[in-house]
Amino acid sequence: MALRLAKRKQDISHLTLVMMDEYLVASERGFEYAGDYNVWSCHHFVRQEIAGPLNEDLPHANRIRDESIWFADPRDAGAFDKKVADAGGIDFFILASGASDGHVAFNPPGSARDSRTRIIRLSEETRRDNLQTFSVFGVLAEVPSHGISVGIETIAAAKEAVMIVSGGGKRLTLTRMLNAERYEPQWPATVIHECAIREIWSDAEAARPMEAL
C-alpha cells in the first residue's frame, strides 16, 4: 500500500486505524500502556510499520492523523466498543492467529463468543508465541503478562475481515480454522467464520499440510 501511495498520491486523512490490542504494564495507577519506545509495543508498530510508511510520501493534509489511530484505554476498556460503534463499526479487520493456541488479538482459548474489549491476563502459550515473534525478548519473564484487547464479539461484528496465515509454524492454526464451521472457543481464531465477509489468506508454507485434510 505504501508503494502504491508513493506512486499514486491519495488522500487518506479520513482513514481511522483501530488497533486490536496492546501490552500493558502495572504501575501505581493501575495498568498502563507499555512505552511506545519498545519495538514490541503496538503503538511502536502502528507508527513505524503502518502509519509511517503510508504517510511518508503524502502531503501533510492527506496523511492519517495521530488522533485517528485508536487504542482501547485500560482505564475504561468498555468504552472502546461504544466508540467504535458510534463511528459506524469496523469496516475491515486484518487478523492473525497465534501458532500454538489459536489466540486472536489477545483473546485466549476459552474466550466467550460475546466477549468485548477488556484487560486480559495473557496465557503462557500466547506469551511464548510472542517470545518467538520478537527477538528482543530474551526470556519468557520479559514478555508482559497482561494486555488490553478487543473481544471476540468486537471482531465478529466487523463488516469484513481477512485472516493472514504465514509460515510453517502456522500450519496447525490454519488446519483448525479450515476444519471449523463456526466459532470454537478453544481456538479463538475460528472467529473468522463469524465475520459477515471473510477470507483466509495463506502462504505455501502454512498451507503445505492441506493435502492431508
Q: Across the structure, where does each feature detected by a protein language model lie?
A:
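Active-site histidine-anchored catalytic micro-motif
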Residues: M1-A34, G89-F92, H103-E124, I164
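Short, well-ordered amphipathic alpha-helices
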Residues: M1-K7, V46-G52, T175-L178
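Ligand-binding beta-strand-loop-alpha-helix segment within the catalytic cores
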Residues: Q10-A96
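Short, flexible loop segments at the rims of nucleotide/cofactor-binding pockets, characterized by
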Residues: I69-D73, G138-P144, L178-A180
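Class I SAM-dependent methyltransferase SAM-binding "motif I" and its flanking Rossmann-like core
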Residues: G102-V150
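ATP/nucleoside-binding phosphotransfer catalytic cores, i.e., glycine-rich phosphate-binding loops
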Residues: V150-E153, A157-L213
